[in-house]
Amino acid sequence: MAAEFWSFLDLPLAPLIEAANAFSLAPHRLALTAEFAGVRFWDDSKATNFHATLAALESVERPIVWIGGGRAKGGNVEAFAQEVAGHLAVAVLYGEVGGRLAQALEDSLDSIHVYTYFEDAVRAAARLAAAIPHSNVLLSPGFSSFDQFKSYEERGKSFTDTVLSLKSAVKAP
């Protein structure tokens, strides 16, 4: 659409193409972190609210192994759980709100796993996704990181570090 408008204005396409090729999202905003063992790993740690998580779930190809949780900061957790349920193959939940999310999802989803610690949830998500062909692990928590981290950036870095360590282990002889 942008190229059509650019052409309509009779402007050269080269600068538009150059700008498009140089564009990238900031870290932890629906970024493809790794792909191995038939699984793609997406880091959307910035998604600290329901709307952002729902947008990510709409953007990532199914089947989705979702990593959700953290610290609730208001909003209707039960209604949010019902909205995400239809997008998920598996829910891997963690943190202060993990148990509450699991209860809200139990009538809508068969595969729900709850962990206290974030890194355990990431490892479990990778293991569970490996059993589902062409799956996507999506960290798009929907809640703040402050139960275990200083910021969403720190949570995103932890996700990346854990995923890359798992990738190294898969490639090790």
List PLM regions with ranges.
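C-terminal helical cap/extension that packs against the catalytic core
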Residues: 78-135, 171
